Amino acid sequence: MDADNSTLPTEQSAVRETCDRDVTMSPRKRRRLSVSLEPELTEPEAAGTPGERCSTADTPESTASEPRSLFNSTPTEGNIAPFLTKHIKDQHASRNRFAPIDSSLPRRKADSKYCYRHRPDLKCRRQAVEPTVDQMQRDLSTLSQNDQQSIAHFWSLFSAAPSKHRNLMLQGIVAQCCFPQLSFLSASVRDLIRIDFVTALPPEISFKILSYLDTASLCSAAQVSHSWRALADDDVVWHRMCEQHIDRKCEKCGWGLPMLDRKRLKDTKRQVQLRAAGKEIAPNQRPQQQHRPWKAVYMDRFKVGTNWKYGRCTTTIFRGHTNGVMCLQFDDNILATGSYDATIKIWDIETGKEIRTLRGHESTIRCLQFDDTKLISGSLDRTIKVWNWRSGECISTYTGHQGGVLCLHFDSTTLASGSKDNTIKIWNFHDKSTRILRGHADWVNSVKLDTASRTVFSASDDLTVRIWDLDTGKCIHSYAGHVGQVQQVLPLPREFEFKHQSNCADDRSDRLSGSESPDHRGSHGYRSNNAPDQQPNTSAPPTEPMSPLFEALFTEDQGRPAPPRYMLTAALDLTLRLWEVHTGRCLRTFFGHIEGVWGLAADTLRFVSGAQDHMAKVWDPRTGTCERTFTGHRGPVTCVSLSDSRMATGSEDSEVRMYSFKA
């Protein structure tokens, strides 16, 4: 023990001499540091047993022939064994399996706190950097044997020390460092304290974190490493991104992407949910059909959304009608148009070529609608015809209206039609029964069925919009506010979301009724919106509150689905209006056209309107602003149609223009 104690002052003197060469300290500071270091070294806790100190080096004769490692100093093992046994008893005991266990040494408590990188009972997650260790080994080998022993001894002590002792050691070292050494320390630590938390965390938590990123940040995260890329490109993350942006406006970034057809299988979505929960998928749960990754879907939709935003599109013009085009509809491959020339034409969208012409009506085709098997058209000859549009055959003809048929809409079981005779007829495809809805005081220009709620919406030249109960034939409610003939009504998809503002309160100045003049007609047989006797009656009362019938029909007790919450209307007063159906409030009025609005189409992201002013406009429903105006027609735009990546307009100039926003 005396020999061990005799080496300590010599070693401390050498350390202090080295520090004096590296840094200039005042005598007071050196004295204060010496006083603070020596008690720490003379504590029994530092020596391992009472009254014993750890030796910093053995004699060169006893150690020169033994191999040395960077983190394992054999000559000093016997001297620091009590220290190692005290603080990492389990690890040290494994190296000295025959050493007796001292029951007097304190045991580690179950709630002992360690940093996660150096817990003695866990494998450290951070591995040593091999190039750095090799360089340290080479640098150490250039020193003398005594210096190697001293440094290795210090490293062994530090490695064995608990967190509190390590902090004290580091504080003492940092206190003696000069600026170059502190700079070296800062540069070395900068990279060491970086933790790859995404890889360290369970996958489901990493997915949750990445789902909060925007697309740009997510793409940047994918460039960090292979493991980050695997997580950032996973379907779980991009499915969440698609849910936030596709077919709706994201509240964070304001972007909304058009909806693709909903043909993705439900079991694939279930796979995404299982992966997000960190669960494995059984082999028998694999979908039978392969689908595009959600990232690819998002990329495709993002390109289309960007083209919509900046107006980047290609235009195809369909020419063939000999008179103005009054109605149109299209799907992925087929375009159908109806005209003043009493014909219906079927077009191939990709080639722009006419496929066939349907002839049979004796007057203007005012409305049409088609699905996979049939096309139904309405004409001013007072008839409705059902066609096999693939073969061109007229299957049946419906008669019953006393005036020209101006509008129609059908679902799987029911057809609704509006006419010049001021009535709406409901036709049942199965039992051939009909019902007449009466209440409008003028031409019925637009009808729309809502199958879920069993209701029908109608717009009329009497300046009102009505909602009807299909089961009873009664008018549920009437909406007034337009000061021109209402040409279109469109219930919006239930997915449509509108953030109500304080200025969305009921505007009583909008709820005005105007006098009617039966002698002023527009170019389509409608009354002109420039009729001199159509002055607002400012003394007219606002529309009455929601009728008790509406509340009685669509309560939770009845179990009947309510109609869509919002609807859109267009009129010859130059405006579009967005309504809240169940309250009757006009939430927003869209101004921009300089003549009456004839055509209207909408989805959850945008509205499209066509007007007498030869223009078609695209609107942002949430801000009320006109995003883009399309020109090119040489006559009034009478009809418009809309899909996720296309828009079509028909005009009295006999042309149809198709705008494609596909990437």
Curated annotation (Swiss-Prot):
Pathway noted in the entry: Protein modification; protein ubiquitination
InterPro entries: F-box-like_dom_sf, F-box_dom, G-protein_beta_WD-40_rep, Quinoprotein_ADH-like_sf, SCF_subunit_WD-repeat, WD40/YVTN_repeat-like_dom_sf, WD40_repeat_CS, WD40_rpt
Region (Disordered), start-end ranges: 1-80, 503-547
SMART domains linked to this entry: FBOX (SM00256), WD40 (SM00320)
CDD domains referenced in this protein's UniProt entry, alphabetically: F-box_SpPof1-like (cd22147), WD40 (cd00200)
Example GO biological process: protein ubiquitination
Pfam families documented for this protein: F-box-like (PF12937), WD40 (PF00400)
Biased composition (Polar residues): 1-15, 56-77, 526-541
Domain F-box: 195-241
Keywords assigned by UniProt, alphabetized: Repeat, Transcription, Transcription regulation, Ubl conjugation pathway, WD repeat
Extent of the WD repeats: 320-359, 361-399, 400-437, 439-480, 544-589, 592-629, 632-663
Skewed-composition ranges (Basic and acidic residues): 503-522
Function: Component of the SCF(sconB) E3 ubiquitin ligase complex involved in the regulation of sulfur metabolite repression, probably by mediating the inactivation or degradation of the metR transcription factor.
Assembly and binders: Component of the SCF(sconB) E3 ubiquitin ligase complex.
Family: Belongs to the WD repeat MET30/SCONB/SCON-2 family.
Protein name stated in the entry: Probable E3 ubiquitin ligase complex SCF subunit sconB
Gene: sconB
